[in-house]
């Protein structure tokens, strides 16, 4: 077996040694403007740009980790003048690590740019908290429920609930949703303004991402946090410091300015970008 690509086109047979050769042929044949290519992989897209004419101003969007070395093909990009390429890193840790590994001249071709998120709504400052879980192991839940009674807690699971969880129905400020439906989840994301990421074991329904995109304030413990990229570090507490978790919850409930401040820090930590940020970085 070879990796050749064979194309029958306009009564001719073309044989390409690899996929990137085929892509170059396709792009030229289609008549696209090739003066600028935006891509997010150092595999076929990178090899394709290396086979294009020299005149070009490309952008590589890099969304993978970088630790102690620069990926080989990325180093080729930085050392080559074949086509001027800006490297836009979308993970902040990877960005700071990369800057330590390249020369000042190369660093001028590297930029950081966060993601834009489709925020569904604003936080309404209501005393409604959501927890989605398929485990009855929920860190400090009963003490939180009893010690922060002004909050109403909605606990949903896509399976049946154990007797341990069902016993929480004795609290008037707890609503339980065993076998929760998609419609119920959507409704609760609209009604709740807090998400407590305090369940052990796996996350369900991409809960923290959904909470973030609905502008719910996310609070978690270090041993339960499923979405640290969406949760401000100051809102992730040691399980040994549950008192501070509860105090933060109480303060956020009683002070809109404080809750707004926490939400701002949450978005800042996630490096939320705007269309203006994208225009500034990539033009």
Describe the residue ranges of each PLM region.
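N-terminal pre-catalytic "stem/leader" segment of glycosyltransferase-like enzymes
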Residues: 1-56, 238, 272
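Short hydrophobic beta-strand element within catalytic cores of glycosyltransferases
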Residues: 217-222
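A charged, aromatic-enriched C-terminal amphipathic alpha-helix characteristic of glycosyltransferases
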Residues: 240, 253-283
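A short, active-site helix/loop in glycosyltransferases that binds the activated sugar's phosphate group
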Residues: 70-109
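Conserved catalytic-core segment of nucleotide-activated headgroup transferases in glycan assembly
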Residues: 115-170, 179-182
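Short acidic alpha-helix that forms the nucleotide-activated donor recognition element
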Residues: 181-192, 213
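Acidic donor-binding loop of glycosyltransferase active sites
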Residues: 190-203
